[in-house]
Amino acid sequence: MRRKEKRLLQAVALVLAALVLLPNVGLWALYRERQPDGTPGGSGAAVAPAAGQGSHSRQKKTFFLGDGQKLKDWHDKEAIRRDAQRVGNGEQGRPYPMTDAERVDQAYRENGFNIYVSDKISLNRSLPDIRHPNCNSKRYLETLPNTSIIIPFHNEGWSSLLRTVHSVLNRSPPELVAEIVLVDDFSDREHLKKPLEDYMALFPSVRILRTKKREGLIRTRMLGASVATGDVITFLDSHCEANVNWLPPLLDRIARNRKTIVCPMIDVIDHDDFRYETQAGDAMRGAFDWEMYYKRIPIPPELQKADPSDPFESPVMAGGLFAVDRKWFWELGGYDPGLEIWGGEQYEISFKVWMCGGRMEDIPCSRVGHIYRKYVPYKVPAGVSLARNLKRVAEVWMDEYAEYIYQRRPEYRHLSAGDVAVQKKLRSSLNCKSFKWFMTKIAWDLPKFYPPVEPPAAAWGEIRNVGTGLCADTKHGALGSPLRLEGCVRGRGEAAWNNMQVFTFTWREDIRPGDPQHTKKFCFDAISHTSPVTLYDCHSMKGNQLWKYRKDKTLYHPVSGSCMDCSESDHRIFMNTCNPSSLTQQWLFEHTNSTVLEKFNRN
């Protein structure tokens, strides 16, 4: 080869190499080279970068789908590394070490969670990455729609609201966030007025809207959605923390199918010490019982994916945290404007999207923490009823299945739902399917856990101890209270059953206070072979709440391998090593169904 040609080839090779190796530096915001926020344990306010400012750590590898669509890794590896190095109060989602002085009721009174603790944790605190390990290697579409993030609030705590905003800014690719819209539902706390305006002026992507009167959560969300400019609307609550790479997995599913509503996995931020952890059972399908309480049920084997980090269908959303294509949201009519304050809206939007041509998914690789309040700290305006909202949803969407609700809540039957003609017309114009279709094709696994027609109970009435002649009694105990042994009121000839001594051994193989038609929502629960028997929220998942009533009259607890026993001297009811000859371990139900009991024991 001649020298001139050789030099030319070398020059071309150098140019090509330079093009390959040239860093792809995007206009990414600095993660948190921040000014101090004045809170212990962390750096402060997120600050918008100067134009053109970027980070070499944001460089991404690009992959390709078979149809030519580009995929890329959206993780901010440098930000993740910095988060891993953070130490201080609440960092890595660890519990704040509370003192007795910080546990006082005053700390919870205004917000329903401990605002003293919240104020001592950095607004930019780090969170544990509790996603499935497969999420680390997932790639999403390189070109994704942007989103308006709508955060409604009413008298929210300062640090909890700001931490919500900071977590979104810190853990979202800036080009995917069209705006963050804070919608103030007529708050009257001073820190949410000019101080909030001044603080949020630091962030060009954040704006604040304010209602002129108390509208409630539902209509406040609608106000935010009405001014949104993003391709997608993402709703969050005002006391959340977005976790690592939470946004691209949501937007990717909508980019592939605009009629998909997507929900992040909702983790729990403890209302006392702000520890961050998964919900019990983690990935589960959203459901409801026939009193319209939200429930979670296991993913059935038929729907389980080979990769547990893949999205999965869910019949019903939890409510406050989801993303939806903006145009699709309005094609569906948004929320029913006749729904008041809050409650029932998650059912309305869930039924609507499934029955009217869309779908809904939970996204395991998108996680957002949420503070579940100890109690609701504000009053619902006079005349507003959650029951009315539920009746309205039932009348518009549930067809003949509404009757199952009215059977359990007879007070709903004659309650006015207001004028639903417009909503029924919307349903007709969208050519929506029937609720029977929804129950048959989408929520087909729900009746296994919450059947419309309650199967017969195995036993009910008083539970009398053979050895002592005394009865199990709740003593009007609150959740978590131990069951007690007391004199049997039926034996004293009282005219009516004492509600504290009436129990039902249900078809779920749990034992609940109340007669078969009116059972309560808490169950006999035991955690070990020596523990007291306590009343705990019924979860319908067996486990600690599974009981067997055997032919020898013992109440056997399979998880602990022990039997329910009692002590007459101190009125305790507790678990003990099974001894069929012990009369204090033998119990008599007032009424039994031998067919059901035989089935239980056979299983």
UniProtKB/Swiss-Prot annotation:
The chain crosses the membrane at residues 12-31. This is Polypeptide N-acetylgalactosaminyltransferase 10. It is a single-pass type II membrane protein. Widely expressed. Expressed at high level in small intestine, and at intermediate levels in stomach, pancreas, ovary, thyroid gland and spleen. Weakly expressed in other tissues. One of its GO terms (molecular function) is metal ion binding. Keywords: Disulfide bond, Glycoprotein, Glycosyltransferase, Golgi apparatus, Lectin, Manganese, Membrane, Metal-binding, Signal-anchor, Transferase, Transmembrane, Transmembrane helix. The keyword Transcription does not apply. Residues 45-55 have a biased composition (Low complexity). Residues 458-590 form the Ricin B-type lectin domain. Its cofactor is Mn(2+). Catalyzes the initial reaction in O-linked oligosaccharide biosynthesis, the transfer of an N-acetyl-D-galactosamine residue to a serine or threonine residue on the protein receptor. Has activity toward Muc5Ac and EA2 peptide substrates. It catalyses: L-seryl-[protein] + UDP-N-acetyl-alpha-D-galactosamine = a 3-O-[N-acetyl-alpha-D-galactosaminyl]-L-seryl-[protein] + UDP + H(+); L-threonyl-[protein] + UDP-N-acetyl-alpha-D-galactosamine = a 3-O-[N-acetyl-alpha-D-galactosaminyl]-L-threonyl-[protein] + UDP + H(+). There are two conserved domains in the glycosyltransferase region: the N-terminal domain (domain A, also called GT1 motif), which is probably involved in manganese coordination and substrate binding and the C-terminal domain (domain B, also called Gal/GalNAc-T motif), which is probably involved in catalytic reaction and UDP-Gal binding. Glycans are attached at N124, N146, N593. Residues 1-11 are cytoplasmic. Pathway: Protein modification; protein glycosylation. It comes from Homo sapiens (Human).
